[in-house]
């Protein structure tokens, strides 16, 4: 069987290698526009920041090494320019000479990836304006950074790559400004209150962020000097554009392959609407594992999973892709973030009845060296108790919380299914009740009516108006609020009316919950706890 693979980075090389492992009698050819294949695109920001020192470390396999390792034939510098499904041929050209060659196939896999979206603004082609996609891009950025001539940089785009670039520029003594046109960072993967908390941490670390701003132009005499926006101008010695990507699928316009906004539609087997043509990676749609709807997941993990599955399906195994959850983790200055599943906003849009909770919980035994906290937002459907999503912020291993959630959501588990799991515990690693389980317990308490709260989003929206703030911290911490020492509450509290609306606030939320439990026992009927306490919320008493 002759299999032609268009694209040789993540999905393409995975398909090709797996095909040859399945059956070495296959003839598998990879056509790749660039000279590098199988490079670490997700590692590019860390090369800029000297976390990865040698550029060779970014190249997982050279074409020569890959060919010897797999038996796949690799043609670099070869760009596919036309596909003719009725003839089962692909026309490709040599990017250096322009010479065209016709390739035949029995099966075709399209894995041509994406390119940065180039905004239609003045000055985008000035010197020292960069995009980040290939090792060559990262090398050019680092070469400029290493001259010591860059003092200020503007990063356009507050997604994962943009923020990782900003962190690594900051580590090299550069002051980065991050701009984004949407109202929050890390959109749409995080609910706004979680994103805003992370933004505050970035600002504390010396990375100013401006959201809701449109970049309108770039000025400079030959090279960038200033970035113009809808609000103000920013001086800059460098600009890194990270404000979106577009699939490299223009050459497929007349093929009959179904697409959505340039992204190839596939079924659960990785097939397009045309027989014997498959698609994977950043140029292809997959589906959301919760909603079943088409989803775009331009992630290296998705590309590799889909590529491996397609290789097996070409061999006739009939394996269906479970779908994606938008799972992601990101390292930022002093804080890591992770997420999977639906946000609360997305869950509402999809017709669920979402209920959520935000906890601040120890990430390991509090007495163990290096112990810190996780801030975990857990979202479930109130009626079915099905787990829908998790978002995590913390200085430690946020990925382990995310990965537990991924497992549960993928299996369509309910909170009851996931309760009381025998998760790993030892003081250096976790807490006796795992942070995931702790948050699940709190959410179940809330659903069952044992924990009445305002979420941070509800509090910020003014829903606690009319409630009197009560300081339930370990020691007085909220100016202007009456202080109540939890351990001394053994009856009605002087100065607090049992009929009064009381908002109980502590450092993290747990102590306020315990206070609520006692006050309820002594006849207080209208108490609410502010989830995540003053660790997460700005609480002021008028």
Role assignments for model-derived ranges:
Residues 1, 7-8, 283-396, 427-431, ...:
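Mid-to-C-terminal Rossmann-like scaffold of FAD/NAD(P)H-dependent oxidoreductases
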Residues 1-75, 160, 166-190, 327, ...:
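Beta1-alpha1 glycine-rich phosphate/pyrophosphate-binding loop at the start
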Residues 25-27, 66-69, 75-96, 103, ...:
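A Rossmann-like FAD-binding core segment of flavoenzymes
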Residues 5, 28, 109, 240, ...:
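Hydrophobic beta-strand scaffold positions of dinucleotide-using enzymes
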Residues 110-172, 208, 261, 266-268, ...:
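Glycine-rich dinucleotide-binding loop and its adjacent helix/turn
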Residues 125-149, 222-226, 233-309, 405-408, ...:
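FAD-site-proximal beta/loop scaffold in flavoenzymes
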Residues 59, 152-153, 160-217, 299-302, ...:
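Rossmann-like dinucleotide-binding cores of NAD(P)H-dependent redox enzymes
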Residues 420-423, 427, 431, 438-456, ...:
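Rhodanese-like catalytic fold shared by cysteine-dependent sulfurtransferases
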């Amino acid at each position: 069987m002759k299999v032609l693979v268009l694209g040789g980075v993540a999905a393409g090389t995975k398909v090709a290698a797996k095909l040859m492992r399945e059956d070495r009698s296959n003839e598998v050819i990879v056509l790749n526009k660039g000279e590098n294949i199988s490079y670490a695109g997700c590692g590019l920001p860390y090369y800029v920041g000297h976390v990865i020192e040698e550029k060779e470390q970014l190249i997982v396999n050279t074409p020569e090494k890959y060919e010897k390792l797999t038996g796949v034939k690799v043609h670099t510098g070869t760009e596919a320019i036309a596909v003719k499904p009725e003839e089962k041929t692909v026309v490709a050209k040599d990017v250096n000479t322009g010479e065209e060659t016709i390739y035949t196939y029995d099966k075709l896999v399209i894995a041509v990836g994406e390119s940065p979206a180039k905004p239609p603004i003045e000055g985008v082609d000035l010197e020292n304006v960069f995009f980040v996609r290939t090792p060559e891009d990262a090398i050019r950025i680092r070469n400029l950074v290493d001259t010591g001539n860059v003092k200020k940089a503007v990063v356009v785009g507050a997604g994962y790559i943009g923020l990782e670039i900003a962190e690594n520029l900051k580590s090299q003594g550069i002051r980065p400004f991050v701009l984004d046109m949407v109202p929050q960072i890390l959109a749409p993967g995080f609910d706004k209150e979680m994103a805003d908390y992370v933004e505050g941490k970035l600002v504390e670390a010396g990375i100013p962020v401006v959201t809701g701003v449109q970049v309108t132009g770039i000025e400079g005499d030959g090279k960038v000097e200033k970035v113009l926006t809808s609000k103000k101008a920013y001086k800059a010695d460098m600009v890194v554009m990270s404000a979106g990507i577009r699939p490299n699928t223009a050459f497929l316009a007349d093929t009959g392959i179904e697409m959505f906004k340039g992204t190839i539609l596939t079924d659960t087997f990785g097939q397009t609407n045309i027989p014997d043509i498959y698609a994977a990676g950043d140029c292809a749609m997959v589906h959301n594992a919760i909603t079943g709807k088409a989803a775009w997941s331009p992630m290296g993990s998705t590309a590799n999973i889909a590529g491996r599955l397609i290789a097996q399906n070409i061999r006739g195994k009939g394996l269906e892709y479970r779908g994606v959850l938008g799972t992601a983790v990101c390292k930022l200055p002093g804080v890591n973030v992770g997420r999977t599943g639906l946000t609360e906003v997305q869950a509402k849009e999809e017709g669920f009845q979402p209920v959520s909770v935000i906890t601040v919980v120890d990430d390991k035994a509090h007495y163990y060296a290096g112990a810190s906290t996780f801030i975990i937002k857990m979202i479930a459907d109130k009626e079915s108790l099905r787990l829908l999503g998790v978002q995590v912020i913390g200085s430690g291993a946020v990925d382990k919380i995310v990965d537990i959630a991924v497992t549960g959501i993928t299996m369509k588990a309910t909170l009851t299914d996931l309760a009381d799991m025998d998760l790993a515990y030892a003081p250096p690693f976790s807490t006796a009740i795992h942070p995931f389980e702790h948050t699940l317990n709190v959410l179940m308490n809330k659903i069952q009516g044992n924990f009445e709260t305002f979420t941070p989003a509800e509090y910020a929206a003014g829903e606690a108006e009319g409630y009197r703030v009560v300081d339930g911290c370990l020691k007085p911490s909220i100016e202007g609020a009456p202080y109540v020492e939890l351990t001394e509450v053994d009856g009605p509290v002087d100065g607090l009316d049992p009929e009064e609306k009381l908002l109980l606030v502590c450092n993290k939320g747990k102590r306020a919950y315990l206070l609520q439990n006692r006050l309820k026992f002594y006849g207080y009927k209208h108490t609410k706890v502010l989830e995540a306490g003053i660790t997460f919320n700005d609480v002021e008493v008028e």
